[in-house]
Swiss-Prot record:
Coiled coil: none
GO biological processes: L-leucine biosynthetic process
Essential cofactor(s): [4Fe-4S] cluster
Function summary: Catalyzes the isomerization between 2-isopropylmalate and 3-isopropylmalate, via the formation of 2-isopropylmaleate.
The keyword 4Fe-4S is annotated on this UniProt entry: yes
The protein's name: 3-isopropylmalate dehydratase large subunit
């Protein structure tokens, strides 16, 4: 009789091709997502070696990082970005890979288009040259980012050399209070364990509060597993998962779907399976959260104040937090509800899905963006944009004064024209608040879509639990 296994154990075991004496394993890869930034050198390596792509049908390419989200008829002005986009178009043509270019309605952020196309499925191993590949773990898949040399290896062999990580489980029980979302859950987790807390582990998210989330909410949580230091994040597939996947363009159909579902249902963690680390949170006690520093672990309640680094005993950590406050232009003791804003960014692979945009529209309908704020909403894909427009969400947002954009990574990172100016302070639904992440000397506060929407209207952070509408 085999020992009880975790969700991660089962997927790992099902994909191991060979194990070396040193413990490293050759892992079969089911799905490979490719974008313009981390793939050019990989494709060039294939050309130099005279190799082909082993499984083009298991690879899907899209442009997202460098595409502009304003008028695309003008083309890409930045020469380096333009070169990367042109290189991807040439590479996918030469190697026979399916590709969504900037004019394809299916185009969007790689971690949004994979799930919505049904390319992402439970039980799969999924890789991409992007750290937020962990997003796909929401489907009960083993998904993680890889480097450019590994991108080349997967293209050539459909395998990857890996060492098995440890198992970690984060259980979130209880019911989320009004105004608290999946984004607040994952920020709370990172605030609890720190940005190194998941190092060397794959996290399985479990518990009543996780099960109650939509697939969009689960993707938000798994997306930021990397910010907690983990290799990947996962949620066991269930009825919510199957309902989302069923009918997607690339998902199995009919009897094939039924057979796949029977396998997916076998993936749940066995009773008594061993976890190397366990963390528990009570959802009922969570407030809306906002980041104050330059690390995703720098989290405080909306009703809290900027912490005082002088209270930190560890000298290195104290100096780090003092540096963060200086960069952010904040003073210890400042109430978060007194922090005013210049910009609001709603989008990214963390919070650029239709559920997120519906929440924002509900928050701002009949209201106006504050005079001191420039606010933009960037749908995560062309299909999300089309659905939002069909529901009238774009009209609500534009009437409120939001800039309604084309899909792409946008202001999540400073690799395209959407950037903060030096010193600007932004409420952002993205995943990283590092120095310069959204533009040189830009100041980023991580929040949920509802918190960002309310901040755009108020011109400062507010407690959305008191929001009417």
């Amino acid at each position: 009789m085999t020992a009880p296994r975790t969700l991660y154990d089962k997927i790992w075991d099902d994909h191991v091709v060979d194990v070396e004496p040193d413990g490293s394993a050759l892992l079969y890869i089911d799905r490979h997502l490719v974008h313009e930034v981390t793939s050019p050198q990989a494709f060039e390596g294939l050309r130099v070696a005279g190799r082909t792509v082993r499984a083009p049908h298991k690879t899907l390419a899209v442009v997202d990082h460098n595409v502009q989200t304003s008028d695309r008829s003008k083309g890409i002005e930045d020469p380096e970005s333009r070169t990367q986009l042109e290189a991807l178009a040439e590479n996918v043509r030469d190697f026979g890979i399916e590709f969504y270019d900037a004019l394809d309605q299916r185009q969007g952020i790689v971690h949004i288009i994979g799930p919505e196309q049904g390319f992402t499925l439970p039980g799969q191993t999924i890789v991409c040259g992007d750290s937020h590949t962990s997003t796909h773990g929401a489907f009960g898949a083993l998904a993680h980012g890889i480097g450019t040399s590994e991108v080349e290896h997967v293209l050539a062999t459909q395998t990857l050399i890996q060492r098995k990580a440890k198992n970690m489980r984060v259980t979130v029980d209880g019911t989320l209070p009004r105004g608290v979302s999946a984004k607040d859950i994952v920020l709370a987790i990172i605030g609890e364990i720190g940005t190194a807390g998941g190092t060397g582990h794959v996290i399985e998210y479990a518990g009543e509060a996780i099960r109650a989330l939509s697939m969009e909410g689960r993707m938000t949580i798994c997306n930021m597993s990397i910010e907690g230091g983990a290799r990947a994040g996962m949620v066991a597939p269930d009825e919510t998962t199957y309902a989302y996947v069923n009918g997607r363009p690339k998902a199995p159909k009919g009897a094939a779907f039924d057979a796949a579902r029977r396998y997916w249902e076998s993936l749940a963690t066995d009773e008594g399976a061993h976890f190397d680390r366990e963390i528990r949170l009570d959802a009922a006690n969570l407030p809306p959260l906002v980041s104050w520093g330059t690390s995703p672990e720098d989290i405080v309640s909306i009703l809290g104040t900027v912490p005082d680094p002088a209270q930190i005993a560890d000298e290195n950590k104290r100096q780090s937090k003092e540096k963060a406050l200086a960069y952010m232009g904040l003073t210890p003791g400042t109430r978060m509800t007194d922090v005013t804003l210049d910009r609001v960014f709603i989008g990214s692979c963390t919070n650029g899905r239709i559920e997120d945009l519906r929440i924002v529209a509900k928050m701002v309908e009949g209201r106006k963006v504050h005079d001191s704020v420039s606010a933009m909403v960037v749908p995560g894909s062309g299909l999300v944009k089309a659905q939002a427009e069909a529901e009238g969400i774009d009209r609500i947002l534009k009437d409120a004064g939001f800039d309604w954009r084309e899909p792409g990574c946008s202001m999540c990172l400073g690799m395209n024209p959407d950037k903060l100016r030096p010193g600007e302070r932004c409420a952002s639904t993205s995943n990283r608040n590092f120095e310069g992440r959204q533009g040189p000397r830009g100041r980023t506060h991580l929040v949920s879509p509802a918190m960002a929407a309310a901040a755009a209207v108020a011109g400062r952070f507010v407690d959305i639990r008191e929001w009417r509408g």
